[in-house]
Amino acid sequence: MKFKRILFLIFIILFFGGQLTLASGLSSNTASAPDASHLSLDEVLKKIEKHYSVSGFTAYFTQTSTIKAMDITDSASGKAFFKRSGKMRWEYETPDRQIIITDGNTLWVFRPEDNQVMIGKAPSFFQGGKGFSFLSDMKEIREKFSITLEKETEEGFFILKLLPIEKTLDIVKIYLWISRNTFDVVKILTYNSYGDETRIVFTNIQLKQELDDSLFSFKTSEGMEVLNLDEQQGQ
């Protein structure tokens, strides 16, 4: 049961889904925001890319995911770290501690409570924009998605609609909420072909010139249970 629980949480983040709904309480500091209503899609994308041109960033996150067929909703929160290219670290604090790490080549999922780590090949889990991989390099948005700027938008935000160029059951549609003031990606909503929904809201976003590479690697220790994630994925 524990192993199934771990896989459930992995697929929530890596094979996510979501729908276009607005989170209450989402703030963009619009009082001091410049008038950006005239910007074209290309101009918005260029500003996002420029804003995230530093090597990495950190943020706190809250995540709500729903598996429609099972009528299950799961919520989680923690802190995330992103670094070009392809490096990510998601530290889940609630409801259970677990850490999802990738250096772009290898994926580690560690549960401290069970002293257990699952190891797999990162590309098979992150290809085609899965697993929020574009957050480690915002230029991937142009490369992996067909993008439109939504006409109906929430005050203080641009809303981008992303359709994967490479069709997959795991991702059908993604929406990004972009602050008109800072050009931070403050919210992500996704859904898959099964109608499953995932919402991620970022707060306290901190752009970093440098994040230590040790954050994006993992070393096993004596006595730790090691499982092959690629084998489990193929079953």
Question: Language-model segments: which ranges?
Answer:
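Bacterial N-terminal signal peptides
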Residues: 9-19
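N-terminal leader/targeting segments and the immediate start of mature chains
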Residues: 21-73, 220-235
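Bacterial N-terminal signal peptides that target proteins for export
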Residues: 1-8
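Gly/Pro-enriched, hydrophobic low-complexity segments
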Residues: 140-230
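Flexible, surface-exposed loop/linker segments and immediately adjacent secondary-structure boundaries
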Residues: 115-157
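An acidic-aromatic
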Residues: 79-129, 198-199
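Extracytoplasmic
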Residues: 54-56, 75-77, 83-85, 95, ...
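Short beta-strands and strand-coil junctions in structured, solvent-facing domains, enriched
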Residues: 68-69, 89, 96-99, 109, ...
